[in-house]
Swiss-Prot record:
Coiled coil: none annotated. Pathway: Purine metabolism; 7-cyano-7-deazaguanine biosynthesis. Binds 1 [4Fe-4S] cluster. The cluster is coordinated with 3 cysteines and an exchangeable S-adenosyl-L-methionine. Binds 1 S-adenosyl-L-methionine per subunit. GO terms for molecular function: 4 iron, 4 sulfur cluster binding; carbon-nitrogen lyase activity; magnesium ion binding; S-adenosyl-L-methionine binding. Catalyzes the complex heterocyclic radical-mediated conversion of 6-carboxy-5,6,7,8-tetrahydropterin (CPH4) to 7-carboxy-7-deazaguanine (CDG), a step common to the biosynthetic pathways of all 7-deazapurine-containing compounds. Residues 33-235 form the Radical SAM core domain. InterPro entries: 7-CO-7-deazaguanine_synth-like, Aldolase_TIM, rSAM. S-adenosyl-L-methionine binds at residues 89, 133-135. It comes from Rhodospirillum rubrum (strain ATCC 11170 / ATH 1.1.1 / DSM 467 / LMG 4362 / NCIMB 8255 / S1). The keyword 4Fe-4S applies. Mg(2+) binds at residue 55. It comes from the Bacteria. This is 7-carboxy-7-deazaguanine synthase. [4Fe-4S] cluster binds at residues 46, 50, 53.
Length: 235
């Protein structure tokens, strides 16, 4: 969306129907579950506008009731797959609690990919993993202790030399901003920003982003991840 999406506030619905962009089966390409077969449920709408975001989460008109959505997930999921990833947009913008509970009741694992700024009362515990990619200075304080891993998008020349993490705003290009930093002991993943299709940055490229992410991991002990699905040219 490259920062052109409307910033939508939390949806007041009860979760018995959700606005969904798409449901698809692929390999999880990022973070702690990288390489694992997964059904992705991409929720529509986001409360932020990240200037480099290349994901379409606004073009769908599909708002299925929960039983219909569960049936579609079941139809996409082969027997070898037990992981469902809720992504966006921002999944916690909507009341995803009923969906998460239904998936856990089926014996499935659920991962939520979130920017961490919104809170929902979820069935935290075994089977549910929260992976946060901070895009702002602060996160919801109730959510922070529930986060299982942090993931940061790294671009060359845009990191803080003291910790190797982003030093520029995601909402206002070029503005210095220290994004939320992870608490001690929580796994941190760094991955290079994919600048394909974004406005050119003179003297910088995707190879530079990868080199900076790798250097950050080596110096500070983070875990480097690359977008496996993009390397394989799959969804």
């Amino acid at each position: 969306m490259f920062g052109r999406n409307p910033a939508r506030g939390p949806d007041p619905g009860d979760g018995e129907s959700l606005w969904i962009q798409e449901v698809f089966y692929t390999l999880q390409g990022e973070g702690p579950f990288s390489g694992q077969p997964s059904v992705f449920v991409r929720t529509a709408g986001c409360n932020l506008r990240c200037a480099w975001c290349d994901t379409d989460f606004e073009s769908s008109a599909w708002k299925p009731p929960l039983p219909e959505l569960l049936a579609v997930i079941d139809s996409r999921r082969p027997r070898v797959c037990d992981l469902v990833v809720l992504t966006g947009g921002e999944p916690l913008r909507q009341e995803v609690g009923p969906l998460v509970r239904a998936l856990l009741a089926r014996g499935l694992r659920v991962q939520i990919e979130t920017n961490g700024t919104l809170w929902r009362d979820l069935p935290f515990g075994p089977g549910l993993s929260i992976v946060c990619s901070p895009k702002t200075r602060t996160l919801d304080p109730q959510l922070v202790p529930r986060i299982d891993a942090f993931k940061y998008v790294i671009a060359a020349g845009e990191t803080d030399p003291t910790d190797g993490l982003p030093a520029l705003s995601t909402q206002h290009p070029g503005r210095a901003e220290r994004l939320f930093r992870p608490p001690p002991g929580v796994p941190v993943f760094v991955m290079p920003r994919d600048d394909h299709g974004t406005p050119a940055r003179p003297g910088r490229g995707e190879d530079d982003n990868l080199a900076e992410a790798a250097a950050s991991a080596l110096r500070f002990g983070y875990r480097l991840c690359v977008q496996v699905h993009k390397i394989l040219k799959i969804a």
